[in-house]
Amino acid sequence: MTIQEELEATKQQFCIELNQVNSSKDLFDLKVRYLGKKGLFRCFADKLRECPLDQKALMGASINECKTYIEEQIREKNDSILLAEESAEFLKEKIDITLPGESHCPGGKHIVKKVLDDVVDIFICLGFCVREAPNIESEENNFSLLNFEEDHPARQMHDTFYLDGKTVLRTHTSNVQVRELSKGQPPIKVVAPGLCFRNEDISARSHVIFHQVEAFYLDRDVTLSDLTEMLTEFYHTFFKRKIELRLRHSYFPFVEPGIEVDVSCECRGSGCSLCKHTGWLEVAGAGMIHPQVLRNSGIDPEIYTGYAVGMGIERLAMLKHGISDIRLFCENDLRFLQQFS
């Protein structure tokens, strides 16, 4: 077979293989096979050197013509493949405008956080300053300095989470009161928000973790009337309606006298499920700071008096929004939470 015939056969074989190429990688492999340093045209170069001198010019021209043809076909095929690949990529990224839009779900404050912020803001407007204390507290600050007897039930492990013999997860934010009273002399007017922990059975009305706000005021001649006036203003602002206040005698180790605070229900006494048909909602525990608590902090109870009030934030949220189960606050159910966003 002459070189001319070999070139023609090579061209035909190339065209067959070129038609089967569908990717840039396959085209590159084909180019290397024909035009690479060890490709088919390397053989033609070797044969050209062995060709008689009078035929070299003609054979050289034929080889170059065939090589040029193959190079042009490869360029055209490459352009075609690139265009096809770009079109495929474009179609892949194309937005289907017939698809339904994706709804965005913006975040928002948790209902407990919203109520907590509202409560703290009201107390700030009433002249209180915000103070905080650790969630992990000594038994002394959590109980002893607040006038809890050694055998008080609240000290037992079935009511309190003990980390060791003398360290607990605080059961109330009253530990802030102990720390603030020991810092200096009155007047002291503080609101203390934070988490509390109690070893209780989880139910619709109680949980092992909850938020509490304690507010206390210590100065000369502070009376129970001052407490009543402050509470009336606070709950009127919080519930955004005029309320009546009812105080019931109760016992708390750190106050004397101790009182339970009720506010009039929105049903105006006609009775509803929220107030259990009593016309009243229990909202807080309060009282005048016990003289022994003041002595424990180095303050003379003959000179200074003060009041303290503690309220559960989840309880306030439940009363304000008619929520019947405290467990809902911890379940992260968007159907519930989005009602208050």
Swiss-Prot record:
Protein EC: 6.1.1.20
GO biological process terms on file: phenylalanyl-tRNA aminoacylation
Keyword Signal tagged: no
Molecular functions per Gene Ontology: ATP binding; magnesium ion binding; phenylalanine-tRNA ligase activity; tRNA binding
Cofactor names: Mg(2+)
Residues spanning the signal sequence: none
SUPFAM superfamilies: Class II aaRS and biotin synthetases, tRNA-binding arm
Main localization (coarse): cytoplasm
Keywords: Aminoacyl-tRNA synthetase, ATP-binding, Cytoplasm, Ligase, Magnesium, Metal-binding, Nucleotide-binding, Protein biosynthesis
HAMAP family, per the entry: Phe_tRNA_synth_alpha1
PANTHER family from the UniProt entry: PHENYLALANINE--TRNA LIGASE, MITOCHONDRIAL (PTHR11538:SF41), PHENYLALANYL-TRNA SYNTHETASE (PTHR11538)
Protein name as annotated: Phenylalanine--tRNA ligase alpha subunit
Higher taxonomy: Bacteria, Pseudomonadati, Chlamydiota, Chlamydiia, Chlamydiales
